[in-house]
């Protein structure tokens, strides 16, 4: 079992895919900007040796020789080494192989039919499916992705996976509603939604987790971005989490970003297999508002599980100083009363920031955690 220092650090999810990866995957010769990006980042984080044939092919303008799969492997190695060079205690591959978090898992299941694109926000769309039959997993997913990370990671890997509530909430629920034909009302719709969530959890997420655990995956982050959309369904989020993880031998955390977390309590606390809440705090932390005051809830409900403390605002290019990160950690520790509860991370994935900004944010986060650690060590002495 890995031993961590006080205030260990982790990432949450995706980072931006480098220009050279996107061009290389398409089989295009790298332009001057991509070539500079490739060489400069390799000099900084050392993700490929000079003799690597994929690297040599990209540098020579022969992306097709590197192959799309080979370029994706390099992208995953780049993200791993960026996180590790920054000093993170838990890492993954920046979701280098993933494009989104909904369509791919749904395509691994029977019982869904894709209907068309709908807008998620601004000019972003996703292909939405309807649940049209009983859920059945065709094949466990993220296995090869995890195998690669496990083989190459120097720090402990933490795999992110989309949770059952979000997959259900982002889909149309035709099958389970149809089972209650002739019935009307909110209670029936809620029962149908509960059945949908649990069906996905038991028939798809759980067997996927079992397959991942069998391959050595010991730490899993279950992402539930939809949890804050319908606060009155927080109990369904918890029930889906429990149905997916019950009896499995791994450490499970839940990531929810940008929500009024108060509205999810106390129902969410019934997610009994959740050992860590990885949440957003920095985005709401301003001179006029204490973004960490909400941590009082954990003392109020006597919940002593770990807190993945968001200390980096992922929606702003402003780079938090180590002093700001340190102050946020120490403020949170004072509110919680137990510094040992805290893991340190960005609010969410850093994919909307440039690689340079994301990297500097992470470097400052790790340094801020180190300073906070030193402060508490001094107090103990």
Give names to the regions the model predicted.
Residues 1-381:
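Domain-level signal for soluble alpha/beta catalytic cores
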């Amino acid at each position: 079992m890995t031993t961590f220092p006080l205030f260990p650090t982790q990432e949450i999810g995706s980072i931006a895919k480098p220009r050279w990866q996107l061009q290389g995957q398409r089989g295009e010769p790298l332009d001057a900007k991509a070539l500079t990006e490739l060489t400069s980042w390799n000099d900084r984080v050392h993700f490929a040796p000079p003799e690597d044939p994929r690297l040599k092919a990209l540098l020579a303008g022969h992306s097709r020789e590197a192959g799309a799969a080979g370029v994706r492997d390099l992208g995953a190695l780049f993200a791993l080494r960026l996180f590790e060079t920054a000093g993170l205690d838990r890492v993954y591959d920046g979701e280098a192989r993933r494009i989104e978090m909904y369509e791919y898992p749904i395509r691994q299941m029977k019982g869904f039919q894709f209907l068309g694109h709908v807008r998620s926000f601004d000019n972003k769309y996703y292909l939405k499916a309807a649940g049209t039959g009983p859920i059945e997993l065709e094949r466990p997913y993220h296995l090869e992705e995890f195998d690669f990370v496990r083989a190459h990671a120097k720090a402990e890997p933490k795999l992110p996976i989309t949770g059952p509530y979000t997959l259900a909430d982002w889909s149309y629920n035709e099958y389970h509603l149809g089972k209650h034909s002739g019935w009307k009302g909110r209670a029936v719709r809620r029962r149908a939604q509960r059945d949908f969530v649990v069906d996905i959890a038991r028939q798809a997420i759980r067997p996927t987790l079992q397959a991942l655990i069998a391959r050595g995956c010991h730490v899993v982050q279950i992402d539930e971005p939809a949890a804050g959309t319908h606060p009155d369904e927080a109990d369904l989020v918890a029930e889906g989490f429990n149905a997916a993880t019950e009896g499995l031998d791994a450490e499970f955390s839940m990531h929810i970003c940008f929500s009024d977390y108060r509205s999810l309590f106390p129902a969410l606390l019934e997610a009994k297999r959740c050992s860590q809440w990885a949440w957003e705090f920095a985005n709401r932390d301003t001179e006029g508002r204490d973004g960490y005051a909400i941590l009082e809830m954990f003392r109020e409900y006597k919940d002593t599980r770990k807190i993945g403390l968001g200390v980096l605002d992922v929606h702003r290019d402003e780079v938090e100083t180590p002093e700001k990160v340190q102050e946020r950690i120490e403020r949170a520790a004072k509110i919680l009363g137990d510094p040992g509860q805290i893991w340190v991370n960005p609010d969410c994935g850093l994919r909307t920031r440039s690689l340079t900004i994301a990297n500097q944010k992470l470097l400052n986060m790790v340094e801020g955690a180190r300073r906070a650690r030193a402060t508490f060590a001094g107090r103990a002495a």
